[in-house]
């Protein structure tokens, strides 16, 4: 399977960002990719009020993604925001394939919220609850968003649900060691799940993080998108600037790794005990 990662730099205008989706999806299709993965917050970058741009998954922006997928003949995974009843939004991925109706046509709401490094995502974002796996040209693809990557159990659960490739769409926070952590986490989650991991991040915004209502603590991207193999090897990686990565993956390697290393098969439940009980 040939996949592409679109490391873009989202702005605050959803219509302009949708044009970026069209541009990169077309380039990915021309390169022969069957799937193109965009970052978290493709619809609108983080660090600005999101409620005013949020739309339902059957709204105009998501339907624009579906149209692009059909016109380009490629499955698109992209980050957007949807409204909730409590005034917050969900941090959502839409996965839309070509066709009428689109196949696949699914969405995932980010489960683990980024209440860390001085940022409180849960103040404006409501969490999702359910892991999601979609099928793209016969390959089972798990969906995750940014901070999810720090939680190995989600990745092993997706693998147990049959995921052979797991997409993580991010707008990673900058800071000392953060790019290195991103790379290490993507490789580690590939090893945990014995899956390919397609880690698509926002490009480094440079000096673009200004504007009314902007938050300096918001994670707005560092680049460094990559594909990791089931053995944790980096198949392909990007720098910090906007770029389209293309990689060929062989899902037979997933089955081979799971058979040879057997992490998922040999994982054993254990009883938690307190410190007093653990003293011999």
Curated annotation (Swiss-Prot):
Recorded GO MF terms: hydrolase activity
SUPFAM superfamilies documented for this protein: Carbon-nitrogen hydrolase (SSF56317)
Enzyme Commission designation: 3.5.-.-
Any single Gene Ontology cellular-component annotation: peptidoglycan-based cell wall
Entry keyword annotation includes RNA-binding: no
CDD domains recorded: nitrilase_3
Pfam families, alphabetized: CN_hydrolase
Domain (CN hydrolase): residue spans on this chain: 1-251
Disulfide bonds, paired cysteine numbers: none
UniProt entry keywords in alphabetical sequence: Hydrolase
InterPro entries reported in the protein's UniProt record: C-N_Hydrolase, C-N_Hydrolase_sf, UPF0012_CS
Broad EC category: hydrolase
Residues forming the catalytic site: 40, 110, 146
Family according to the record: Belongs to the carbon-nitrogen hydrolase superfamily. NIT1/NIT2 family.
PANTHER family given in the database record: DEAMINATED GLUTATHIONE AMIDASE, NITRILASE-RELATED
Stated name of the protein: Hydrolase Rv0480c
């Amino acid at each position: 399977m040939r996949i592409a990662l679109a490391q873009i730099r989202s702005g605050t205008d959803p219509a302009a960002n949708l044009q970026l989706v069209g541009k990169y999806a077309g380039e990915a299709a021309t390169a022969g990719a069957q799937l193109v993965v965009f970052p978290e917050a493709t619809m609108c970058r983080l660090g600005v009020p999101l409620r005013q741009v949020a739309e339902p998954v059957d709204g105009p922006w998501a339907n624009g993604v579906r149209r692009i997928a059909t016109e380009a003949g490629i499955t698109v995974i992209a980050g957007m925001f949807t409204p909730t009843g409590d005034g917050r939004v969900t941090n959502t991925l839409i996965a839309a394939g070509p066709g009428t109706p689109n196949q696949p046509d699914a969405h995932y709401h980010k489960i683990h919220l980024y209440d860390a490094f001085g940022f409180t995502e849960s103040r404006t974002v409501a969490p999702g609850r359910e892991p999601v796996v979609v099928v793209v040209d016969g390959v089972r693809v798990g969906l995750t968003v940014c901070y999810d990557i720090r939680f190995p159990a989600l990745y092993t659960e997706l693998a147990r649900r049959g995921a052979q490739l797991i997409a993580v769409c991010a707008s990673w926070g900058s800071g000392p060691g953060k790019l290195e952590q991103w790379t290490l986490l993507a490789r580690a989650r590939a090893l945990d799940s014995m899956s390919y991991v397609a880690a698509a991040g926002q490009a480094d915004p440079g000096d673009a993080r200004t504007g009314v209502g902007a938050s300096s603590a918001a994670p707005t991207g560092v680049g460094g998108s990559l594909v990791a193999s089931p053995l944790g090897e980096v198949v392909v990686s990007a720098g910090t600037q906007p770029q389209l990565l293309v990689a060929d993956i062989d899902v037979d390697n997933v089955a081979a790794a799971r058979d040879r290393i057997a992490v998922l098969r040999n994982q054993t439940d254990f009883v938690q005990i307190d410190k007093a009980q653990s003293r011999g």
